UniProtKB/Swiss-Prot annotation:
PROSITE patterns in UniProt: CULLIN_1, CULLIN_2
Modified residues (N6-acetyllysine): 393
Domain Cullin neddylation: 675-735
Chain positions with Phosphothreonine modification: 661
Name of encoding gene: Cul2
Name this polypeptide is given: Cullin-2
PANTHER family, per database record: CULLIN (PTHR11932)
Covalent cross-link site, Glycyl lysine isopeptide (Lys-Gly) (interchain with G-Cter in NEDD8): 689
Keywords: Acetylation, Isopeptide bond, Nucleus, Phosphoprotein, Ubl conjugation, Ubl conjugation pathway
Organism field: Mus musculus
Keyword DNA repair: no
Amino acid sequence: MSLKPRVVDFDETWNKLLTTIKAVVMLEYVERATWNDRFSDIYALCVAYPEPLGERLYAETKIFLESHVRHLYKRVLESEEQVLVMYHRYWEEYSKGADYMDCLYRYLNTQYIKKNKLTEADIQYGYGGVDMNEPLMEIGELALDMWRKLMVEPLQNILIRMLLREIKNDRGGEDPNQKVIHGVINSFVHVEQYKKKFPLKFYQGIFVSPFLTETGEYYKQEASNLLQESNCSQYMEKVLGRLKDEEIRCRKYLHPSSYTKVIHECQQRMVADHLQFLHSECHSIIQQERKNDMANMYVLLRAVSSGLPHMIEELQKHIHDEGLRATSNLTQEHMPTLFVESVLEVHGKFVQLINTVLNGDQHFMSALDKALTSVVNYREPKSVCKAPELLAKYCDNLLKKSAKGMTENEVEDKLTSFITVFKYIDDKDVFQKFYARMLAKRLIHGLSMSMDSEEAMINKLKQACGYEFTSKLHRMYTDMSVSADLNNKFNNFIRNQDTVIDLGISFQIYVLQAGAWPLTQAPSSTFAIPQELEKSVQMFELFYSQHFSGRKLTWLHYLCTGEVKMNYLGKPYVAMVTTYQMAVLLAFNNSETVSYKELQDSTQMNEKELTKTIKSLLDVKMINHDSEKEDIDAESSFSLNMSFSSKRTKFKITTSMQKDTPQELEQTRSAVDEDRKMYLQAAIVRIMKARKVLRHNALIQEVISQSRARFNPSISMIKKCIEVLIDKQYIERSQASADEYSYVA
């Protein structure tokens, strides 16, 4: 074919073209040669001489399409009950034919229509150069537009009514023609799919809106029927079944954009409209832990707004009640272990339930945390919360040498699990005080099962609460290794003296930082060191002063222990004793009988401490009370028990020093209160320094927020701290408002 423009007879060329496009649009056979000739004819018309005939070709093609669609419309109308089937048949034929026509008219589309086509801006803001009423469209688009205007819109009511009826029959169990229904609905999408903006607007307006209304009505009635014939479990099962069926139905018939809208409408009618009924059954389902019902209820309630909160609240109450039942009435002897293991058991049970039944939903995990927080921090009216102390004792039991039958790995696993419970404590500072006191006893008295386990536990607490929380614990741990090094240096110091020095005893010492250890430096009694120990103490003080100038050593004799060999019996016994007990026993080196007054003079101990020490030796029958009176007084005298015997050749004499006393517990809690006051005062100063001016309520909220990681401060305590800082002139009340504070620089 020649590409050169030439004179063309439009009527003759159009008649040939018309015959071909009639065949094309009806999917009749067209020979390849004919197709090529018609393609050339369209080109010739578009480049015709003296003037192109593209505009006339477009107009005639449009007239043909209008005529053809009107003809098909009449035939569909005449089919009566077969409207959907006939519509679908003609649509399938017409839409494919329109695609072929669009290919045939490719040159017209690209060279004439696209060049003269209005842009979206032209349509929106107006453009005088082209007739605004009839914007040009590519031939494929024009064909679809004709179908929409001349077929779909006139048949709209009939088509929609029939489609809704067929889908309703499908819901009722009948088996309608899926291909026809899907094809008809898809035609509503296809006729405007070429549009760049809102291509689904026509489909949504003509079909989706009435379909959603019909769906809502249908499932409203369906829910009403189901409620009359079912209990809650059955209702949930059936509703889930209906939702699944409707989802399959959506995929069979509708455009993907409609799936969620339809399912949402079903959920509104069958779930949201009956929330009160579902919520009323929620309590018994959770109380009885009916897992299948819980899973079904979760799936249903999750899908509607304000559906889940009630279920979350019910589960939280249930976990709280079960937790309290598990942790109450525990035997006193094993309370720390039973308490922690009971909480872990409840935690493990409900974590598994939430993961397997409730899809691991974080809202329920948060409810679990809140419930167990209230369980762990529960306290009887007018009593303190026992959890911090119990948890500290639990760790103490695990980390002591007396934790029999457990390997280090088993202890490690238990301590890792323990952190789960620890995180629920509000008063972490109370735990820290008890833990530090128990750690001190383990370290000083050599009771730790393993120093590696001690360090691992401190690191776990550090990960949970930060460096500041464990800084003192770290220093205590470090002091032990530093002391071991110090002992080696001291032994070298003794060996390297010019004159040979015999201390007379093997001697080990711990040098502890006063600020890190929870130890009272004020002894409960005065004390004179036994002569046998004096030399070693003096030499260590000399060594220490030479190595660390400016440091002051304070001897904590009440914490010291030693071993005493008993050479006066048939068996070679060794007694592990406190320094106070040692001082009393060493008095018997010079005499088998010693009076109370002599002991008082030699030890310089006060009456209370001396009496307690003597009593501990009487209890194990190492000495005898040479008096008919039971009570110890100034006239008492004591003698060595020469017939003493024990199953063990090495034994320990326990004292109240190693046991927890009510006074110690009270001291610990008092120390916590003092620390809290200082912490709150520091927090208030920090906040006010940054903010300069702050209202009362805002300051209190800031302080609570900053303190929550360590403890939950009471508002009354915060107020007292504010008053203290006003007295100390760190802050002042604002002159403008009594409800406002200013930072004093």
